[in-house]
Amino acid sequence: MIEVKHLKTLQALRNCGSLAAAAATLHQTQSALSHQFSDLEQRLGFRLFVRKSQPLRFTPQGEILLQLANQVLPQISQALQACNEPQQTRLRIAIECHSCIQWLTPALENFHKNWPQVEMDFKSGVTFDPQPALQQGELDLVMTSDILPRSGLHYSPMFDYEVRLVLAPDHPLAAKTRITPEDLASETLLIYPVQRSRLDVWRHFLQPAGVSPSLKSVDNTLLLIQMVAARMGIAALPHWVVESFERQGLVVTKTLGEGLWSRLYAAVRDGEQRQPVTEAFIRSARNHACDHLPFVKSAERPTYDAPTVRPGSPARL
């Protein structure tokens, strides 16, 4: 059977006018190209061009295949170009990480400058559970620290971050060198309005120790920080979220146990992670976060249905 490479070779021979010139264009030796034509002609059962003709003359069969090359090769080129061009015109994004809005908004603006043709649709809400919506095709990408096993989703790591205990500067726990789960038993833990089972501090610090402090929901980060500063409770937040408040002296942060680390992922439906728009957004958002957020570590290795990696926790390394 004739292959695409044979059509390209025939076209090069027509354009160049001789075996020697065609061989140079194709970065082959003249003898190798001559052998290739002889082998093809033997398999096809007919000659393609007249040897040693000046100017080079193609046989009727060769002319037919040249017409085929002129029709097929441009179509192949156009198809490959279409495959490499973005087919998405809209990117529907949601977050499970309440604190992520602080860096994701400028990351979205930065991405839109380079991909102005892509409509960005950002969905958020304290009662919104985005991963099932992603599975059902209602969203294209979700920022999350939770991996759903056997979900049909692909999780691209964004960055690792430490969850720190956030306290008023004059809180008694601020003087402790080591924070244990029992230290929080009598405290009021201020949390975002999500189920406690989705909180890293609950799943990986308090629950294993059998400690259950009082919980109070707060809608946004700024109010939460103000309540902590007023000794109305304590909180557990990503270090990068509270860095500016800590620098101002409004709050202090402490390491939880040996260090509680989590990883943020960009979740998409498996098989769609290589779509040009999706891939470009994940790369752009990751780079923006790692360039602008303090106390985060870049994480680029793809993860499929794996538990959250927590650097510094030997049981999870």
Swiss-Prot record:
GO CC annotations, alphabetized: cytoplasm
Keywords (A to Z) from UniProt: Activator, Amino-acid biosynthesis, Cytoplasm, DNA-binding, Methionine biosynthesis, Repressor, Transcription, Transcription regulation
GO-annotated biological processes: methionine biosynthetic process; regulation of DNA-templated transcription
GO molecular function (one): transcription cis-regulatory region binding
Job of this protein: Control of the last step in methionine biosynthesis; MetR is a positive activator of the metA, metE and metH genes. MetR is also a negative regulator of its own expression. Binds homocysteine as an inducer.
Record's subcellular location: Cytoplasm
Pfam families registered for this protein in UniProt: HTH_1, LysR_substrate
NCBIfam families: PRK15421.1 (NF011950)
DNA-binding annotation, residue ranges on this chain: 19-38
Domain HTH lysR-type, first and last residues per copy: 1-59
Family: Belongs to the LysR transcriptional regulatory family.
SUPFAM superfamilies: Periplasmic binding protein-like II, Winged helix' DNA-binding domain
The name this protein goes by in its record: HTH-type transcriptional regulator MetR
